[in-house]
């Protein structure tokens, strides 16, 4: 069984027992989280597609940790001017483990 959820403006295909990194959520480590923006639920041949959400469906997850991702380096050049600007960014994330899918 798998589901497609929406979190932080992105869509994720999740299965029970899977861990994934979501955009930062204000939830403490070890707490249980309910994701109710479920776009699709599939169980073998039974597929439920929402318009836009599947009613009554939710995905439960446990918060494993919070952290920051890899550094993204931004470099801007101005040609022939001997000018360069460097900048870096590390995005915060919340790592969750999917504990259940209900439809």
Swiss-Prot record:
Similarity field: Belongs to the bacterial ribosomal protein bL21 family.
Taxonomic source organism: Chromohalobacter salexigens (strain ATCC BAA-138 / DSM 3043 / CIP 106854 / NCIMB 13768 / 1H11)
UniProt GO MF annotations: rRNA binding; structural constituent of ribosome
Cleavable signal peptide: none
Highest taxon in the source lineage: Bacteria
Functional description taken from the UniProt entry: This protein binds to 23S rRNA in the presence of protein L20.
Coiled-coil blocks: none
UniProt GO BP: translation
Record-linked SUPFAM superfamilies: L21p-like
Alphabetical list of NCBIfam families matching this protein: L21
Subunit: Part of the 50S ribosomal subunit. Contacts protein L20.
Gene Ontology annotations for the cellular component aspect, listed alphabetically: cytoplasm; ribonucleoprotein complex; ribosome
Protein name: Large ribosomal subunit protein bL21
Keyword line: Ribonucleoprotein, Ribosomal protein, RNA-binding, rRNA-binding
């Amino acid at each position: 069984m798998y589901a497609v959820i929406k979190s932080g403006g992105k869509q994720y295909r999740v299965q029970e027992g899977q861990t994934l990194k979501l955009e930062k959520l204000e939830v403490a480590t070890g707490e249980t989280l309910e994701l109710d923006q479920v776009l699709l639920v599939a169980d073998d041949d039974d597929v439920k597609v929402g318009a836009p959400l599947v009613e009554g469906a939710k995905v439960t997850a446990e918060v494993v940790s919070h952290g920051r991702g890899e550094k993204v380096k931004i470099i801007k050049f101005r040609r022939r001017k001997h000018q360069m600007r460097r900048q870096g960014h590390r995005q915060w994330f919340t790592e969750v483990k999917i504990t259940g899918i209900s439809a």
